[in-house]
Amino acid sequence: MTKVKICGLSTASAVETACQAGADYIGFVFAESRRRVSLEQAQKLAALVPSTVRKVGVFVSPSLAELQEAISVANLDLVQIHGDFDEELLTQIDRPVIQAYQVKGALKDVSQQADYLLFDAPLAGSGRTFDWQAFDKSQIHQPFFIAGGLNAGNVREAIQHFAPYAVDVSSGVETDAQKDLEKIKEFIERVKDGI
């Protein structure tokens, strides 16, 4: 069954709702964003997460020190990296790594070292999908997440089209730029129940 990651969580109610509804992964954004959480916030929110749900820290072009501090303080299970960074960094992190790519056409230079890959729209967090028809997964050898413009209305189609390891949503479960608890539940239900 396809796994679910709810990303950009910043409140206790959103974390608890996602966990209770059956999310497999929850994401805390440490990069510059309206969804950004401080290390202190992430630590408090992480304490609400049961051991059955994996905590992911989301970073853009991080340093090793940034990653290590967040892993330690927020007890992260995985890190998700966007942007430019030295591939050698992947070997220095003692957590599985999700390497994110903004899909702008044909895939090229896809990491063979990352534990997971994530494919997102050209502008992450925009609520827009990338061109699904142009996506060629023949060179992908790791489990992968699909993100970018997903919501309860299109997630089943995305799963049927890509057969991904997991789907990842942030803006698709928001109303007026805030996490919507009902949309979180509906999204997870659509994935888990195949509705």
UniProtKB/Swiss-Prot annotation:
The keyword Isomerase applies. It holds the Pfam family PRAI. Pathway: Amino-acid biosynthesis; L-tryptophan biosynthesis; L-tryptophan from chorismate: step 3/5. It comes from the Bacteria. Its EC number is 5.3.1.24. GO terms for biological process: L-tryptophan biosynthetic process. Keywords: Amino-acid biosynthesis, Aromatic amino acid biosynthesis, Isomerase, Tryptophan biosynthesis. One of its GO terms (molecular function) is phosphoribosylanthranilate isomerase activity. It catalyses: N-(5-phospho-beta-D-ribosyl)anthranilate = 1-(2-carboxyphenylamino)-1-deoxy-D-ribulose 5-phosphate. It is an enzyme of class 5 (isomerase). Belongs to the TrpF family. This is N-(5'-phosphoribosyl)anthranilate isomerase. The gene is trpF.
